């Protein structure tokens, strides 16, 4: 059971909200979160790097000069890895880096990572109505009132993206906007401050506690 203060648009405390997310045991928490993080970063790799071996490089079928009598080092092909323009020894080939992790484990890692950031979590009431039109300056000022300085890396978690909020947020350099049902371990751990709306918190409990 975790308790957090709820703030309004002006940055004033207007109440408390209690939520419960099942997390990993203390002895295994770091391990499972680390596994989820490694999986996410590894699966993001394209795996498309490719080089040609001496067998795949065009040309080089003819021996460039005779074996003996020239005074030069012997050579069998102009596509030897020792030659400029030759094949690559043990170079990269396209491969699949995907790591598998059970869905239950992934969700457990997400919940554990989220709860581990409780000290940096800022819970706010819905504020889309406070922005009558897209205004980045107003949103930056709100973050400052909530205790999240614009210079720090901020993760803003919303249940949905109202147009005024999205347009106001997209030009803030260190801000990342994410939907409550699209959480990932890297963003949760990478942010300095995590700002969550009350409806987004309810969505997180609904989606990830199952």
Swiss-Prot record:
Region (Disordered): 41-71
Regions of compositional bias (Polar residues) in chain numbering: 41-52
A Gene Ontology molecular function term of the record: rRNA binding
Bias kind Basic residues: ranges: 60-71
GO terms classed as biological process: translation
Signal peptide (residue range): none
InterPro entries assigned to the protein according to its UniProt record, in alphabetical order: Ribosomal_uL4, Ribosomal_uL4-like, Ribosomal_uL4_dom_sf
KW Phosphoprotein (keyword) present: no
One GO cellular component term noted in the UniProt record for this chain: ribosome
Top-level taxon of the source organism: Bacteria
Subunit details: Part of the 50S ribosomal subunit.
Function field: One of the primary rRNA binding proteins, this protein initially binds near the 5'-end of the 23S rRNA. It is important during the early stages of 50S assembly. It makes multiple contacts with different domains of the 23S rRNA in the assembled 50S subunit and ribosome.
Protein name according to UniProt: Large ribosomal subunit protein uL4
């Amino acid at each position: 059971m975790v308790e957090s203060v709820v703030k309004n648009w002006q940055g004033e405390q207007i109440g408390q909200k209690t939520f419960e997310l099942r997390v990993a045991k203390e002895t295994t928490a770091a391990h499972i979160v680390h596994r989820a993080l490694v999986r996410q970063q590894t699966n993001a790799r394209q795996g498309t790097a490719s080089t040609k071996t001496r067998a795949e490089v065009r040309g080089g079928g003819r021996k460039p000069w005779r074996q003996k009598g020239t005074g030069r080092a012997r050579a069998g092909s102009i596509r030897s890895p020792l030659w400029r323009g030759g094949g690559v020894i043990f170079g990269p080939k396209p491969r699949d880096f995907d790591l598998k992790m059970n869905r239950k484990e992934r969700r457990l890692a997400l919940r554990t990572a989220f709860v581990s950031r409780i000290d940096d979590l800022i819970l706010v009431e819905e504020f889309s109505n406070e922005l009558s039109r897209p205004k980045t300056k107003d949103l930056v000022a709100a973050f400052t009132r909530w205790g999240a300085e614009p210079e720090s890396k901020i993760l803003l978690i919303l249940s949905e993206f109202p147009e005024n909020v999205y347009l106001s947020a997209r030009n803030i350099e260190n801000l990342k906007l994410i939907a409550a049902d699209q959480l990932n371990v890297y963003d949760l751990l990478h942010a300095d401050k995590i700002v969550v709306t009350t409806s987004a918190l309810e969505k997180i409990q609904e989606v990830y506690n199952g």
